[in-house]
Amino acid sequence: MRLVVVGANGRMGRELITACQNREDIELSGVLVREKSPFVGQDVSILIGSAPLGIRITDDPENAFSNADGIVDFSQPQASVIHADYAAQKGLVHIIGTTGFSKEEDAQIAISATRTTIVKSENMSLGVNLLANFVKKAAKALGAHDFDIEICEMHHSKKVDAPSGTALLLGNAAAEGRHVALKEVSASGRNGYTGERKKGTIGFACLRGGTVIGDHSVIFAGLNERITFSHSAQERSIFAHGALKAALWAKNYKNGLYSMLDVLELNN
């Protein structure tokens, strides 16, 4: 399968380029960076410190996507919306690991997914998506009257959005388990005199510092007992592995908007 890596000079872009090079079933056909990037025109090897690969870095989507079967996209929300439209026009699989979308941007991607196959997930890690499945089941079994839910996440100091996309994925899983909308029960940013915790809310605590790739814990706190589900990302390569797995899965599926839960057959 021939793939283009979008956001190639970012942390995840570099991981994806390396991951593609280590696979026999995937060929890196192009890389795309932001317009007027200083990397434009150079061999992609400059991004991963390897021998020349014969692939030129470009900021032109038409050029990058011309010989591809799919796109793997860890960029910015506005850019991912544009790439989804390109993918729909050309019939390319689109794997989206970008986070921080607005409701309007999500709606635009959903429209593009009527014309091509898109897998969009706040976290491409196989472990995190299995964790989300556990959280949903636990939330269903442990009712709001008996157990409070708190989600704690920590990321590196350069992360610009909070709560993290993964924390929201886990929050949505918990909310689905209790048949409520996360936006109606979410609680974050506690400070000063807050009063007692409101029953049924799902709390978020967001920590930032150092080079932490991603730590997430979901705590079910009841009377005299506490259950904690947690996941710690040791390397970004786990996200690249999941994204490539999603691309290979998506090439055999009909048009539509899917998530990693679909890829892992956890949505049933």
Swiss-Prot record:
Sequence similarity: Belongs to the DapB family.
Binding site for (S)-2,3,4,5-tetrahydrodipicolinate: 156, 165-166
InterPro entries from the UniProt entry: DapB_C, DapB_N, DapB_N_CS, DHDPR_bac, NAD(P)-bd_dom_sf
EC number: 1.17.1.8
GO cellular component, one term: cytosol
Known pathway: Amino-acid biosynthesis; L-lysine biosynthesis via DAP pathway; (S)-tetrahydrodipicolinate from L-aspartate: step 4/4
Active site: 155, 159
Catalytic activity: (S)-2,3,4,5-tetrahydrodipicolinate + NAD(+) + H2O = (2S,4S)-4-hydroxy-2,3,4,5-tetrahydrodipicolinate + NADH + H(+); (S)-2,3,4,5-tetrahydrodipicolinate + NADP(+) + H2O = (2S,4S)-4-hydroxy-2,3,4,5-tetrahydrodipicolinate + NADPH + H(+)
Job of this protein: Catalyzes the conversion of 4-hydroxy-tetrahydrodipicolinate (HTPA) to tetrahydrodipicolinate.
GO biological process, one term: lysine biosynthetic process via diaminopimelate
A Pfam family of this chain: DapB_C
Compartments, as annotated in UniProt: Cytoplasm
PROSITE patterns assigned to the protein according to its UniProt record, in alphabetical order: DAPB (PS01298)
Protein keywords: Amino-acid biosynthesis, Cytoplasm, Diaminopimelate biosynthesis, Lysine biosynthesis, NAD, NADP, Oxidoreductase
The encoding gene: dapB
Main location group: cytoplasm
Record-level Gene Ontology MF annotations: 4-hydroxy-tetrahydrodipicolinate reductase; NAD binding; NADP binding; oxidoreductase activity, acting on CH or CH2 groups, NAD or NADP as acceptor
Organism listed in the record: Bartonella bacilliformis (strain ATCC 35685 / KC583 / Herrer 020/F12,63)
Disulfide pattern: none
Residues that bind NADP(+): 34
Name used for this protein in its record: 4-hydroxy-tetrahydrodipicolinate reductase
Residue positions binding NAD(+): 7-12, 97-99, 121-124
